[in-house]
């Protein structure tokens, strides 16, 4: 019987390092189209490869299931609760920045986000999901990270913090160590991203949001 081989977890597998990006994207200056408000999509379209890999498959994935998959691929379910929450918030805010700015659609692609760690987060088709992560996502899935007077969710980047160092980004192992010391979720996030980082909440909509003509944003 054929058995699917699940790729390695990012904390011990060999994956490309994240290519640094600005955490706040310029909008409206060179024709980019963005959503009118921050929303939580019902679905995202995941391109299972690098953006330019035309052979990679696109998957329609429920937003919550996507976040659960990424979190289970990026961190360990045995970590302290505040570290799990901090990492999930960073994953969600990064993802919602891609949604809000229509980052890939503005580049001519028909997907929301990729599974390449060089560009986005690790998403593994068909992987197992851990309860401790699943429960947190179900509780806080409408949240994202914001800064004062910035409309878009912050593109909160991170790295493992052991094999790779990333100043001004969150260290995944470092977040676990801070949680072990009793840091709260927001204290962990502010330790890495600065004191003007806040947790915000958006409304959930049905379907896949788009600013292009022919689509309506409906509240789910």
Language-model segments: residues:
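Conserved, single-site charged/polar hotspot
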Residues: 3-220
């Amino acid at each position: 019987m054929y058995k699917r081989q699940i790729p390695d977890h990012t904390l011990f597998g060999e994956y490309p390092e994240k290519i640094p990006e600005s955490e706040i994207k310029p909008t409206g200056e060179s024709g980019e189209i963005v959503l009118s408000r921050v929303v939580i999509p019902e679905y995202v379209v995941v391109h299972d490869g690098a953006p330019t890999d035309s052979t990679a498959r696109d998957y329609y994935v429920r937003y919550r299931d996507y976040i659960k998959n990424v979190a289970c691929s990026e961190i360990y379910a045995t970590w302290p609760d505040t570290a799990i929450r901090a990492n999930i918030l960073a994953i969600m805010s990064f993802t919602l920045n891609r949604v809000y700015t229509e980052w890939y659609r503005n580049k001519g692609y028909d997907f929301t986000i990729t599974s390449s760690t060089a560009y986005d987060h690790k998403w593994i088709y068909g992987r197992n999901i851990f309860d401790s992560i699943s429960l947190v996502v179900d509780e806080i899935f409408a949240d994202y990270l914001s800064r004062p007077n910035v409309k878009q969710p912050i593109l909160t980047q991170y790295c493992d913090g052991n094999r790779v160092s990333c100043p001004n980004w969150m260290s995944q192992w470092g977040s676990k160590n801070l949680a072990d010391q009793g840091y709260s979720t927001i204290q962990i996030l502010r330790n890495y991203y600065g004191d003007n980082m806040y947790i915000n909440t958006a409304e959930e909509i049905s379907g896949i949001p788009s600013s292009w003509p022919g689509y309506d944003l409906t509240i789910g």
